């Protein structure tokens, strides 16, 4: 059923209204690495005079709250891009082994040499004390490194509890075995992240459930001790050659999911459990919200997938209400298409879809890859599956020939050749868990693995290749290829963002200013050189990653 359901109500947050008056020059679409330099600069050193590499130096604009982070090199030097003149806060993001450093009300106007930043260590020991202010800076990987337990016990957590929230959200709590049993039962039997509908069968069997509960009660029980933290290495070399900008969004608890860019340089984002979608103007930090018209009574609102087509029409999926909507920013009108799916409302319908060059939606569900009319919801073409019931993610190659998707919760991928009708369903290693992904310029399908594995289906060899992540206990939700064939993805729970070169099979990990990296979908601006990478963290801020090479 198709329904025209009126205009979205555009709302501008108070901070965004103020930010919109900033007189920023309109940046050209193309950029070079030199354009990411030329701003305030300085040196970071320790109290004993040692030059420090890999320190995250951050300036926060008072008017817009935009956070810009750069990294000190091997000589302790850092350099910001050109910034709008104004008042800023200078701070060190995630100082970890060092005491916090903050300098308020700093006037910035041009490429000034800033006073040296001198940091004092919290401890000279290799391990960091379990202080609350240090715990708040540590990644999920570092939390797991500090806790006792077998590889089997930790693996139960990392392959079953890693895609809806941070590990910190779990480990900040303390319960006895009965309390953890109630939580694990709710989390593993709830349908999707809302946990409204309950399934009689959990995500794993009773024996494994008991093992996980016992381990949690041991390491995070009422009387368990807090061991010191093992800190992952700071960035070095090419890892420091990046500028990361963060844009705070105007609401709490948005559960933000996807981003996509339009032709005007705006970034659209989808809150997973909210009635609003939003548009960020990166030049000013202004955020405009649009209210998606109400869903039926008793149904959770929220937009899962978001995509901007070549005409700047915005598309989104309502995973709990089981609809697709189309939004025209010029008229601010939504049009909703209700999908007939077997799942009950408030349970996920499989909301990660793909739009092909001709405007059709693709997905794999119900033992078939399907081409669907975007404005009707009618199935136009089907390619039956023999092994998997469907895919978690959906992608269409740039020429429109291939469909691809990760088969999570099964271990494998689906790739369909829509010209020949061939369908490939290769398996991958146990618990690799490919979910979302995209095609590279050569037509290879890449997928982010829930079990910490980057997966490629080589379209020429018709084979699957696996590349394990370099950081322990890291997970992935998605992976995206740029114009050069390099692969980008957030390392969930590791506080890192990966860049993988398939030619050399080498990773670069950019360390993030916040200890999360919960990235559900990446949008890459291929018009810049180097490319510019965007994602929205699940906890409510949009991130721009600009490598210098």
Model feature map: region roles:
Residues 512-549:
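Blade-level signature of beta-propeller repeat domains, shared across WD40, Kelch, NHL, RCC1
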Residues 64-65, 87, 91-107:
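A short, solvent-exposed loop/turn motif at the edges and junctions
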Residues 157-168, 212:
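The canonical Cys-X-X-Cys-His
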Residues 252-263, 296-310, 342-358, 387-400, ...:
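Beta-rich, blade/repeat-based domains predominating
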Residues 62-77:
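Short, acidic Ser/Thr/Gly-rich low-complexity loop/linker segments typical of extracellular
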Residues 52, 79-87, 95:
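Short Pro-Gly-centered beta-turn/loop motif in secreted/extracellular proteins
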Residues 267-273, 314-320, 356, 361-366, ...:
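Conserved beta-strand positions in repeat-built beta-propeller and related beta-rich domains
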